[in-house]
Structure formats: C-alpha cells, structure tokens
Amino acid sequence: LSTPVTGVDQTGAPVTLPVVTEKPVTLFLNRQEIVTSMTIGDWPAELAVGYFLNQNMLRADDEITGIDHDEDLGVVIVRTARETDFEAKMKRKIRTSGCAEGTAYGDMMERFADIRLDPDARFHASWLIPLSKAINTAPSLYLSAGAIHGCVLCEGARPLVYMEDIGRHNAVDKIAGWMFLNKVAPQNKVFYTTGRLTTEMVIKTVQMQIPVLVSRSGFTAAAVELAREAGLTLIGRAKGKRFIALAGEDRIDFDQSDGGSGDEFRDAPSLQRARQGEAGR
C-alpha cells in the first residue's frame, strides 16, 4: 500500500520515504461499468458495495450473488439477484468537494429526506478520550506514509473497524460496505472521521443510518444545515476533552472523565491485521 521512494532532504542528504500507492479501480454493478476511482487498493469488495449503497444503486434488501475482483485489471464486479440499469443515472454528475473521484451529489440525496435516525441513541462525552487515543495510536498507513484519510466505525468507546484511503469518500464507502457484508446494525454506532465535516460526510453517515458523526476537524455551513435537517448529531473539533456540537446535541451525555485507556483497539480489526486478511482473499 506504500512504495519506498528516494530523494533528498533540506540539507541535500539522501532519504528514502514510504509514499502511498495510488491506483485506479473500476467498479461494475452486474454488467454495467459505473465508475473508476483512485484508491490505495485494499478492501475492494467493501469499497464497491459501499459505493453502490451510498449512490442508491444497491438497496438494503438486495441479495449479492457474487463479488469478483481482478487486481491485475483493477476491476471489481458486484453481482446481484436483482437486475439493474443505471444508464440514465450515470449521465448526470455533480461532483462534491471530496478528494479524488468524488461522488454524485444528486444521487446521494435521493433517499435523504426519508431516513429517520434513532432518536434514542446516546453519545457520552467521556468516550472521546479513549476513542481518540485508540484511533491515533492504531497501526495505520497514515502513521507510516501520511497523505491519507481515516474513518472509524465505533460502538460506544470501542472502535470496530478502521478504514483509510487517499479520498475520504472511499474510506466512508469501505465502512458502508463492511457493515452491509457483515450485517452490522447502525443504530447504536458512532462514525469518526479524521477529515472535515462536509455535506458528503453528513449525507453518507445519514444514509448508513448512523446517528452520530464525529471529527477532529471543522464544519461547513451546508453540512451543519443538513445534519440539523436529518437529526444527526454532528460533533467537530474533537481534541482531548474539547469538542463543539452544532447539531443533535440532545443525544449527548456531558459526563466528561478520562475514560478508558485506549486499549480497546486491540480487539478491533486493525489496519495491519485487516490487510493481512485482505491479502489472503
């Protein structure tokens, strides 16, 4: 997922630096080519399924009959029992502010107004410290090479899975696909992202029916407006005990304490172990 590259530092001395590998992958839904996206190349099945879910091309009740991945060709084919045809949809593209390929804003908004997030879900402020510690110290491509976005699916103060990619939209899609393929319920989950809180992040979190979105970065005004409209708890600038909630603050229990040790990630699929499993597919 990274390549050693030689160069020189500010003194002219030779250096070797791990640099993130970037490669195209083309996603097919049944017989139709849908999109080509630049990615780091891991979790191809989850990326494809998550992308189609977040573009409203796959439904929650769809039966996936097979997923084929050809690494040499850079192709992933998702096959479903239901026949699909998205020729008209592929003709209209309004790109979002996400990195790399981006997504079609209009397609993502198709079901947005109909989704109802769990009103009884809670977020404890005391979870932030153990979550942040676990996420910041987890084995990751970011720590070794940088130039990467990370997204984490959490349950309480326990991270469940951590996905990375050069575009944050890819990292989100991988988590959406992972949840679908592993039949993970979203109602009591927290979504943590290292990137800024944009409309794309809000829309995809709502589509996954996750009631709480957290970032150590800031907000856009449009994202806040959408979060309020959807009833999403939107927490930004989360560093240590400090955070700002601009939407859905009624879900928050303000019970600040030092919380856990951050060792919860030992039981989560770390990037290192996940990639070992990916290589064996």
Q: What name fits each language-model region?
A:
Residues 136-138, 147-186, 255-260:
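N-terminal-biased segments
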Residues 8, 232, 273-276:
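Compositionally biased, low-complexity repeat tracts
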Residues 266-281:
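Long, low-complexity, intrinsically disordered segments
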Residues 1-156, 161-162, 281:
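Intrinsically disordered, low-complexity regions enriched in acidic/Ser/Thr/Pro/Gln residues
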Residues 50, 56, 146-150, 167, ...:
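Glycine-centered flexibility sites
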Residues 168-257:
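Feature captures the catalytic cores and cofactor-binding loops of soluble hydro-lyases/lyases
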